[in-house]
Amino acid sequence: MPQFMSPAEKGFILSRHWKDTRHGVEVSYWLITDNGPRKVTVPLQQAIAFVPLSSLPAIKPLLDEQANLSYRPVELSDFRREKVAAIYCQQYRQLQNLDKRCQELGIELLETDIRPCERYLMERFITAPVWFSQNQQGEYQLKPCDSYRPLIKAVSLDIETSQYGELYSIGLSGCGDNVVFMLGPEQGSALNNTHRLVYVNSRPQLLDKLNEWLQQYDPDAIIGWNLIQFDLNVLQKHAERYGIPLQLGRQGKKLEWREHGFKQGVFFASAEGRLIIDGIDALKAATWNFPSFSLEFVAQDLLGEGKAIDSPYDRMDEINRRFHHDKPALAHYNIQDCLLVHRIFEKTDLMAFLQERSTVTGLAVDRMGGSVA
């Protein structure tokens, strides 16, 4: 009997996720659609790797002792044009452990580094735009849809701190709102009507306000300038200090971090259901080049305008002075940085470039520096 499927809808992949369960690998995606964000979960998957047929006898005893594992020859070849067998595991962690044991035997398994959420897309020739439909069990099926380019709703985030990294304020511009959350005591209202100025009594309350704003306005993307290595890094340290989760993902999911495999002290950040895009990395990915990638230099070059503090030499002193004696002026400086980043993205059409790159290559929209070979 044919399985009923809901009418197909168009979506564009924002983020990709997987987790092991007792019965298989759960794979899900957050999409932008014409009807808002959607989280879709596909039927349970197996974790898959390959091994040259010539190496199969050496690891066959190891494979045969594994529960919830199967293997068989397939009509595929490796780069040496040797036929391979596919190995199917019920959990991805099981496959990773198997890979380690095979390495100890001097046998290399192929494609063990491909995450289940990436493999699902690859095997269906899906890059970023998709058709999706749902069956009676609530599971989704995805198919490629090359023509869909939705509007990505972005918020520009910028923070101000002391020279010691102590948080002064958080500025947000996007989704119809411009606001600065400022550590008190209160020193007056916003200098003009371009933004709201909201005072709070403590740094934990600054983090709470950020979490609340993101859940209320629900952006598809968070953009900024040196966003991950500075702004989000400082916010994460404050979150750990005060025991407050940094809920930058949709459905209140916490910000996730991983360290660069080769560059010490360089980190990647991800938020479920949202893109995290650093303006500097995005411009470089789009082959823009400047003598300096400082926000002041790029803004002056592209927009003919710059920061709300003219001199770069005593900028830190001026930020400290404004925080202690003129908080409305600091809020103006903070929101101006947010607005500059937005205008740079618009001027260079960066978001459209990143969507197109993702559609052509299959790289995540906010993935920077990956190979497209």
Predicted regions and their residues:
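The two-metal-ion catalytic cores of nucleic-acid processing enzymes
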Residues: M1-I280, A285-A373
